From Swiss-Prot:
Name this protein carries in UniProt: Homeobox protein Hox-A9
GO MF term list: DNA-binding transcription factor activity, RNA polymerase II-specific; RNA polymerase II cis-regulatory region sequence-specific DNA binding
Record lineage: Eukaryota, Metazoa, Chordata, Craniata, Vertebrata
Localisation: Nucleus
Region of interest called Disordered, as start-end residue ranges on this chain: 157-181
PROSITE patterns: HOMEOBOX_1, HOMEOBOX_2
Amino acid sequence: MSTSGTISNYYVDSLIMHENEDLLSSRYASGSLAQASRQAALTEHPDFSPCNFQSKATVFSTSWSPVHAQSSANMPTVYHPYMHQAPIAAAPDGRYMRSWLDPMPGTLSFPGLPSSRHYGIKPEPVASRRSDCTTFETHTLALSEYTCGTSPADKRVSEVSFSENNGETESNADKLHMDPNNPSANWLHARSTRKKRCPYTKHQTLELEKEFLFNMYLTRDRRYEVARVLNLTERQVKIWFQNRRMKMKKINKERPKDDR
């Protein structure tokens, strides 16, 4: 216990003494008091001769001078001083507004640049919503008309594609309606699957009738000549003569025996 108490007291005393010495040195550091104390010590001890110390050369030949801030006029034009930026304020709706979107003042003054030249920046209002923008209303209307409007060629192309799509949908609907397992649906939506007959004109029919009355059977050479004159194929001429002969046989069967 005694040893620890002695060490603690010594530690406290050393701290107190150092603090007192610092206070005294800071409080009585003036040159007049130091000279007075030195003269009193010399008078009290006359036996000792005063010591004269030779002055040593200073390490630095020139005296230190405080560094002065350079004026803005001497700075080059490329130098731009640091400008403090205002803190970003929160928007009313809780979002942060970016600083580079804020409108800049009309003229900017820089200390390093001559004041005679002004860099004008046109302020542009930043609209938060599209409904708030009133300055660009005419441009927006023009753009909307341009984007919404279509050229006549585009309209024709769209109409043609629309009609083709309608035709495809109708054909698909017909295919859906014609179900082989549902005969009633087939009967209601049935279409003629027979190939269309070749339409003969009145002039062609008249010439074929004349040729049939003259000769019911045609040779191959005569068939070729008739087809070339009437602008038909040999197959068409052959089929027409076959049908005409069948029709004539049917008429002959239906006649009574007395009329034969």
